[in-house]
């Protein structure tokens, strides 16, 4: 008899949820502090009240064994001696509209818990109580119903019989999938050099899973240079492991849409090579990008009265799933949009619901790591998941951003202005919070006056609005670090967070009472900003610092996560294994440290391409340090000219900043007008990016030199194979800009391990260098030249970070020597 594991809440909601998607503001997140409210009510219930009681049972229905699990909010015995199952729900529904039958799912959940508990305790009957906590009034409304054990059993059996066809569908698919994956063959005639080694490492990690030594799951770092075929080298072995029962679902997590497409292409290749392959995949895309019915401003309008795809969604979704799951399929963005139109359902929610029935889920990092938007249906508890994390060199910065939060004083000032004249609880709360941040701004300027090297014209308010005899009413703690109107504190500033928390309740009340107000969107944005900063405060620990920055009349409050290691570690622990891979993961000690994988195995694979295909040169007589940049402009221009004049074709030059890029481009265009150039603008959408890259045509009639920024959208994740790109120059070692935040990061890691400069500057910089250089050689047939421009590339601190396939680098003395060696390279 087949066995199906089924969370009780999932059973109830799947069968009984009806109606529409409705994302109108209800303030429900204020109640979700729901967990806090639950604990508050549970504590108030007294000593005889058992809170969060774990219940599980095996029940048979339709020749299937169901393993049901869940947690009852509370179980107690009342004054009559009757056992009561308490189901607590927080709600923003007005008290007069809270009725006994307003949500059948609530009773159903309590009744299932009751059926399990009554059977285990041999109780002939018990009570189920619904406790509604109304978040606006703090009112508690309760409803009680008595059930016999027989009635509860009949109810549970009925639910299981209704779910049985869906369970049978899952069982049959799992058998078919396992058989199919066990016979899966590598889709190419042979492995590329290094590809089998990478596949073997990932296969072993997936098989190992959680062990006594790896309770958070097996972790693997794999540095695989361009050309190995990382995507297939990761997916194929993970799927083979799944076919052997090692992993229930595979999550392929990426930093960019381009790598999501690579994963889709790899899966399509497997389907093409093995047409009967039983494998379903879904690609999750941001709601804003897949919405079929946006509002006038282009934003999703997830309201039943505005969107036909939201209206009645839960009434139609099971029919849509039934039709879509009858075959094998790859549900990418286009397929989801087509299915959504066909069944008149929201494509974003359809993707989420399909993910529960798919074997491979492709999506952004945030679906696992972001504390707000992660997939709660999977990751609120651990599961038999396999994680493949592509472009893992991006994860440290992305993770820091996910766990940090930022709030601007101006949003309070603008909200007060938007509300107009008159008194209200909201305006009072906004005024208090605004005043607190104003005083913090004064204290910030006093603690960290702007240096004279900064122009007063750029920030006149630093002096004109703060007379010398001004004494801020708010006194900040002794700062960790203070410079140029930026102050870092170890502890979160309660004097600022408390008034911001006090804004939430009246702001919520206003939003609920004024859904059609012209400024509703503005105040809703403020609500979410306050919510973000207060949520970050709840996570705040020794891995965070507080940053206060005064700019003119503005004060920015940031709760900065300097070290995301414990949070990334906790996220990865939700699965059985995690393989993190990239072309640049050196040194491994750095990534182990910042990603919380101290015991992870790390492997570095050699490049599969012949070394002679890459001409690698360095002119170490040029300094591109910030203080030397103006003096270096002509030398850099001349070196770029020698690079591109050696052979007609497409080239890129990558710079550490837009300002330096523009300086050199202006000089280059003036002195070498015969060479066509393209300049990367600071903000390009997907269409503009594609248009830019389309200029890099195969075998061009004239030379093209693109000017781009290291670490930007062209510095990595771009595949210009063959003659679409035959060379690039890397101008500088890519160090992040020196600023107070980066300096705080350096100080933090200096205190942690003594490698502050490496962690904050050198390692991230060289990562960008290696990523940019990796754009040139994409296939075994490619030939190309890479030119490094900076004297630091000749220093041991940087040479030790070079990959093995850079051993043949040549250091040159002049542009004339560069021209000569390039001529030799291209003539071979």
Feature locations, PLM:
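Metal-dependent nuclease catalytic cores that hydrolyze phosphodiester bonds in DNA/RNA
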Residues: 1-78, 82, 108
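Mg2+/Mn2+-dependent nuclease catalytic core
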Residues: 57-154
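Conserved pre-motif I regulatory segment
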Residues: 173-223
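A substrate-engagement module of RecA-like helicase motors
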Residues: 178, 185, 246-361, 369, ...
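Signature of the SF2 helicase/ATPase Hel1-core->accessory helical subdomain module
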Residues: 234, 261, 341-360, 365-502, ...
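A contiguous, basic/glycine-rich beta-loop/short-helix subdomain that forms a polymer-engagement track
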Residues: 336-361, 371-378, 506-623, 631-634, ...
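Conserved RecA-like P-loop NTPase helicase motor core
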Residues: 620-631, 682-793
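Conserved helicase motor "Helicase C" RecA-like lobe of SF1/SF2 P-loop NTPases
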Residues: 656-681
